[in-house]
Amino acid sequence: MSTEIQTELHQAVELRRNFAIISHPDAGKTTLTEKLLLYGGAIHEAGAVKARRAQRKATSDWMAMEQQRGISITSTVLQFEYQNCQINLLDTPGHQDFSEDTYRTLAAADNAVMLIDVAKGLEPQTRKLFEVCKLRGLPIFTFINKLDRPGREPLELLDEIEQELGLQTYAVNWPIGMGDRFKGVFDRNKQQIHLFERSAHGSKEARDTTVELGDPRIEELLEEDLYYQLKNDLELLEGVGPELDLDLVHQGKMTPVFFGSAMTNFGVELFLKYFLNYALKPGVHISSVGEVAPTYPEFSGFVFKLQANMDPKHRDRVAFIRVCTGKFEKDMTVNHARTGKIVRLSRPQKLFAQERESIDVAYPGDVIGLNNPGVFAIGDTIYTGQKLEYEGIPYFSPELFATLRNPNPSKFKQFQKGISELREEGAVQIMYSVDEAKRDPIMAAVGQLQFEVVQFRLQNEYGVETILELLPYSVARWVDGGWEALNKVGRIFNTTTVKDSMNRPVLLFRNEWNCQQLQGDHPELKLSAIAPVFSSQTVE
């Protein structure tokens, strides 16, 4: 490898940060996302997040159904610069029904920001997504939000994170007041108080007055009881809390905690500055040839998301690719690991929600969009040089099932195309009965809203009305060993056998008890709640 390329890759990796935000619905994720973009200069004025408000639509909520409802349904990639760093923000759905899409996005992230509502603390979706981050070993940075509203005691929230998630906590800053008396935060590292002035609806950057802890001006700027409370809290923190250990942070064992209000912009820029210093840079990835460093000179990356019809004016399909190693260049040819084909990567795009601009180069940690004429599937690896493949992205066990019928025969082709594209995109899992007479697809999802999204998009983007009929199942299990293992068992009861999109057997059960009963009757049959992962997944 030439010294020039080595230096170029090293510098690019040093200046890149990549993260996803995980949260429960309504914790303020879309608002925080927009405020980070505001401070990064990517947008000049933050739009309101609720679709019904008269202001602009939120930048990251672009799909028609999202704009109608004011919630995030799909994952979006937002790229911006701050203090010379290239930041890739993988904006994940906040709605509880979309944990599977969120999981796929977390596969492309190097860090996670856990967003918590100060009034509610840890909520079910946050816990679930934390487990996914833990599984992947991601460093977790905590932002406790909505300090401009009444909430729980900060020390109580730190204790909850430690007790329930098993994470050590280190408060990087500390709130001064709460609710309508929320004045700012204290930076523990620099021993400085940041007092904020509210901007109109938080649409502009917050003005910040910074004073040292012992500065006599504090008595003029801060009410006496708030200053007294701050000093008491800091004494408690210094007495019982651990020191910040970045090695533990990078191992996912300690979380730096920040307090603020995304709505009013209080504490957002301070969080962003510290995050850039503390977060992991793009690192090694496990592949079929072992660990591969980002500075490896050959290009490689993997597909973590497919999205059809990002622009309704152009019925296009885009593959989201996480660059893992080397340098991506426009019009380069790469090997497609699953098919063995050589693919020319033309018209690469930098993604910013629905807006896209052409790019010429990209580096490890970046996410690029490639037009996808049916070439790519989720989990695919592309590379130059020596063959390598990254581990695929698994499917998780769905909990809701329904048949989907097209009552209009003249719309058969549109229906088939829509179902195929939405399945490839990961909007929903599609299964089929083993009975050839039953041709209607079976949708499998982790939440009811996924069904609504599929029906809405079939109508809105493909012009197909559909009829949905719920099925009485709540548990799905893949059969280890495939059809051969299943056929050896012979006849089984209290289950329905279907096949997934890769023609693998899946057993559907009405409840967990039926599933356990089958495993008790046939211990030789090994079942899995996660679909088997093959680096090269061939659709039959």
Swiss-Prot record:
SUPFAM superfamilies: EF-G C-terminal domain-like, P-loop containing nucleoside triphosphate hydrolases, Translation proteins. GTP binds at residues 23-30, 91-95, 145-148. InterPro entries: EF-G-like_DII, EFG_III/V, G_TR_CS, P-loop_NTPase, PrfC, RF3_C, RF3_dom_3_sf, RF3_GTP-bd. Keywords: Cytoplasm, GTP-binding, Nucleotide-binding, Protein biosynthesis. GO terms for biological process: regulation of translational termination. One of its GO terms (molecular function) is translation release factor activity, codon specific. Gene3D superfamilies: P-loop containing nucleotide triphosphate hydrolases (3.40.50.300), Peptide chain release factor 3, domain III (3.30.70.3280), Translation factors (2.40.30.10). The keyword Transferase does not apply. CDD domains: RF3 (cd04169), RF3_II (cd03689), RF3_III (cd16259). Residues 14-283 form the tr-type G domain. It comes from the Bacteria. Transmembrane segments: none annotated. The keyword Transmembrane does not apply. Pfam families: EF-G_D2, GTP_EFTU, RF3_C. Increases the formation of ribosomal termination complexes and stimulates activities of RF-1 and RF-2. It binds guanine nucleotides and has strong preference for UGA stop codons. It may interact directly with the ribosome. The stimulation of RF-1 and RF-2 is significantly reduced by GTP and GDP, but not by GMP. Belongs to the TRAFAC class translation factor GTPase superfamily. Classic translation factor GTPase family. PrfC subfamily. PANTHER family: PEPTIDE CHAIN RELEASE FACTOR RF3. This is Peptide chain release factor 3. It comes from Trichormus variabilis (strain ATCC 29413 / PCC 7937).
